[in-house]
Amino acid sequence: MENFGIVAFVLFIVALVFIVKTIKVVPQQDAWVVERLGKYHATLGPGLNIVVPFVDRIAYKHVLKEIPLDVPPQVCITRDNTQLQVDGILYFQITDAMRASYGSSNYVAAITQLAQTTLRSVIGKMELDKTFEERDHINTTIVNAIDESAANWGVKGLRYEIKDLNTFILAANAHQQVEIHSHRQSVPH
């Protein structure tokens, strides 16, 4: 009789572990990617979900809310050879959890690099005066470039905001900039 109690207790514990491993509750605005034996099987949406224990595993957990990403400040050179330090923030959202998991090894680094290279390209085509006036154009161009490329990564760029635009002149270029400025002042208009 004593053995029956121990066996019943062990079976109860095994059943409890089985139930805990089977039932998964995904929070609202989340998506979990399930792999079955190492291969993509399904994406679990919010609510109560059932998986096969010891065969299925939760490989990735993604938040589907809007995510702010601080893009590191970088130096950009305008068409008139003025250096700007530009600091911005990118807002994005995961639209496809499966693609976000398998489309890129690191989608955050990928969209950060894409935002930086697009920013350098756009500012390189403008003169200094235009960069301050055309902030909205710069922001829109960056978001469009991210949307084009990031669709394969399961990510959508929502908006990009330039936080800070700072001009600075390096010591080596200071003399040249002063000469150009004085030459412009001496030429009659």
Could you say what each language-model-derived stretch is?
Residues 15-18, 30, 119, 178:
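A general, composition-driven signal for non-globular sequence regions
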Residues 177-189:
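Assembly-interface segments of oligomeric complexes
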Residues 2-23:
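Single-pass alpha-helical transmembrane signal-anchor segments
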Residues 17-37:
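Transmembrane-cytosolic junction motif
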Residues 13-16, 172, 186:
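Prokaryotic Sec-type signal peptides and long signal-anchor helices
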Residues 4, 44-46, 183:
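Feature targets compositionally biased, intrinsically disordered low-complexity regions
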Residues 34-45, 49-177:
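Amphipathic, interface-forming alpha-helical segments with heptad-repeat character
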